[in-house]
């Protein structure tokens, strides 16, 4: 009997680890005829149905997550009408803790596999092939004689049994691949489903490194570890980090979720030596309100956490993501503002402002009503208000989040935004007010072009205080610098002048004609036939002030777009064309 595993990812660049595990593990256990397909939530449901139908699966397994569960259930309802004979099985975190309810409300779903899927999926296929009784399929919920039967859950798998999931890397050069070396989490944060898993299991270090070497050999751009707390066991974390440093291919970036208070002096010293761009860290702060931290059952010291983050960031070699969650118990708008300002004082490369979601099966779901929380009953189950924060205030934070994403996390306006923030009393107040400014002018009602976005930033900067008018020439040069870092300046706002390049046109042309310019400063363009061609692909910009020091003097910077850093910024060289 053939089976098709269906994944619907949130973005095209994402890949689904679970369906790959099931395919490879079942093959390892002698089950043939299992394959998977991947789509995204942006694709039309009829198109997905069309493609799946053409494959004629006898068994269809849906991989259900918070971002796709509604789409999966809609898919099942429609597909069942077309192919009533197809057995449709749902699995994944969004159905594991409400299997009875899902089966009661969705007649198109025939069965549900709860929890870890590797062993139960093999058992289900053995049952469908006549090799096992249905009562012996662990973690399975199904209908029988007008009732719903829920079999006992399977024991947790030994991670040494896990196969390498990405057997075909040929079509993944422009996608993110995921890797798992740990299951479970030693902490019990009330909002997180990982707190339900009682044990922490580790893949043997030698096995993990052997699997990671496959990614290194293929030079995939990024590997994201899905381990909830990668550094919960120092020997495991350091073993993998040291292996990746010793076998660094100069290309692949590795993303880890860490708990900062477990990072000790030895780890900090080691991390300060790694290649810039090799590692990327995501550290959950969630809140700096001590009452909130205690209520959500986080075991951390905020002061220690932030100090370690600063020390990691000080080396300037690791891309740092810090997270906050809005809507947590005991955290009102003012308290959230204080949390935001404390975290932003580190100036992380990414400031991820999330909103509390009430996940089925979590401790937060048990407590939510006592907190006065109102939340969406459909995915993503986001909180609207609580005893501590109103819906109006959550809307303020939502508008603010859009500004943080657009102007801070995008990295497109780094220097201009930093210039603004350096003149503010509170980063929170800046982004909060920017969000209200954006909505007051109805900018949220239509998409904005890049030149429109930078113009809106300029207008908001001018609206903040009168003295900003005097700073406008510097601010505008920083906007131009931000644009040049990411691409050649083409379509610019009317207020943004590049007159300096006209003034120094002959010097710029002479610079590109120098025989040493391309081989020395732009070797990535050596295959181009002539300097004029290179001049149109790379870029030399003359600024009326130094973008780094803000000193008022003509400054020439060469931008190499074929040697970008991890954030997509062009390689820069300060050049002297003025002699």
List PLM regions with ranges.
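N-terminal [4Fe-4S]-dependent radical SAM core
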Residues: 1-3, 137, 141-178, 564, ...
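Proline-aspartate-enriched helix->loop->beta-strand connector
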Residues: 56-60, 220, 348-349
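Radical SAM [4Fe-4S] cluster-binding motif and immediate context
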Residues: 160-314
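Internal alpha/beta domain cores that form substrate/cofactor-binding pockets in large enzymes
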Residues: 2-7, 24-55, 59-60, 67-86, ...
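A structural motif corresponding to the C-terminal lobe/cap of the Radical SAM core domain
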Residues: 234, 246-249, 255-262, 266-430
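Glycine-rich beta-alpha loop elements in corrinoid/cobalamin-binding modules
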Residues: 25, 33-153
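A short, glycine/small-residue-rich beta-strand->loop->alpha-helix junction that serves as a flexible
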Residues: 9-17, 64-69
């Amino acid at each position: 009997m053939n089976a098709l595993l269906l994944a619907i990812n949130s973005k095209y660049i994402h890949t689904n680890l679970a369906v790959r595990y099931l395919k490879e593990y079942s093959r390892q256990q002698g089950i043939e005829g299992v394959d998977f397909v991947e789509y995204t939530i942006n694709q039309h449901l009829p198109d997905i149905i069309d493609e799946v139908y053409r494959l004629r699966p006898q068994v269809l397994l849906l991989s259900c997550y918070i971002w796709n569960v509604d789409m999966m259930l809609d898919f099942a309802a429609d597909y069942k009408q077309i192919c009533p004979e197809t057995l449709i099985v749902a699995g994944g975190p969004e159905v594991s803790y409400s299997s009875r309810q899902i089966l009661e409300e969705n007649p198109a779903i025939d069965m549900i596999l709860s929890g870890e899927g590797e062993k139960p999926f093999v058992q289900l296929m053995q049952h469908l092939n006549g090799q096992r009784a249905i009562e012996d399929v662990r973690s399975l919920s199904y209908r029988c004689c007008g009732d719903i039967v829920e079999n006992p859950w399977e024991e947790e798998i030994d991670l040494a049994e896990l196969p390498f999931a990405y057997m075909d890397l040929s079509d993944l050069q422009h996608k993110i691949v995921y890797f798992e070396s740990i299951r479970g989490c030693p902490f019990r944060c009330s909002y997180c489903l990982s707190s339900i898993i009682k044990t922490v299991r580790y893949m043997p270090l030698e096995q993990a490194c052997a699997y990671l070497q496959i990614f290194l050999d293929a030079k995939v751009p990024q590997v994201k570890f899905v381990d909830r707390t990668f550094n919960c066991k120092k020997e495991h974390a350091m073993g993998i980090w040291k292996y990746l440093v010793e076998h660094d291919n100069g290309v692949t970036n590795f993303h880890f979720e860490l708990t900062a208070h477990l990072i000790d002096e030895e780890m900090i010293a080691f991390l300060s030596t790694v290649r810039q761009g090799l590692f990327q860290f995501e550290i959950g702060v969630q809140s700096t309100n001590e009452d909130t931290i205690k209520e959500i059952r986080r075991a951390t010291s905020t002061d220690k956490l932030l100090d370690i983050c600063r020390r990691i960031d000080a080396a300037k070699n690791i891309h740092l993501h810090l997270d906050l969650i809005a809507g947590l118990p005991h955290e009102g708008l003012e308290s959230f503002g204080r949390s935001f300002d404390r975290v932003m004082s580190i100036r992380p490369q990414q400031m991820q402002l999330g909103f509390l979601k009430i996940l089925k099966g979590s401790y937060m779901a048990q407590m939510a009503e006592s907190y006065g929380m109102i939340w969406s009953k459909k995915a993503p189950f986001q909180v609207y208000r609580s005893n501590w924060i109103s819906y109006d205030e959550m809307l303020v934070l939502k508008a603010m989040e859009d500004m943080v994403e657009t102007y801070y996390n995008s990295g497109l306006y780094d220097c201009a935004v930093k210039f603004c923030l350096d003149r503010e009393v509170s980063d929170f107040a800046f982004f909060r007010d920017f969000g209200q400014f954006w909505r007051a002018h109805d900018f949220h009602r239509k998409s904005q072009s890049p030149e429109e976005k930078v113009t809106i930033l300029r207008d908001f900067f001018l609206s903040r205080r009168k003295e900003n008018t005097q700073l406008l020439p510097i601010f505008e040069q920083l906007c131009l610098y931000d644009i040049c870092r990411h691409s050649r300046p083409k379509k610019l706002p009317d207020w943004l002048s590049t007159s300096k390049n006209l003034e120094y046109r002959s010097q710029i042309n002479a610079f590109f004609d120098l025989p040493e310019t391309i081989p020395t400063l732009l070797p990535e363009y050596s295959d181009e036939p002539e300097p004029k061609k290179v001049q149109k692909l790379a870029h030399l910009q003359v600024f009326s002030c130094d973008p780094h020091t803000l000193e008022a003097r003509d400054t020439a910077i060469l931008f190499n777009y074929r040697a970008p850093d991890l954030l997509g910024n062009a390689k820069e060289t300060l050049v002297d064309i003025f002699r």
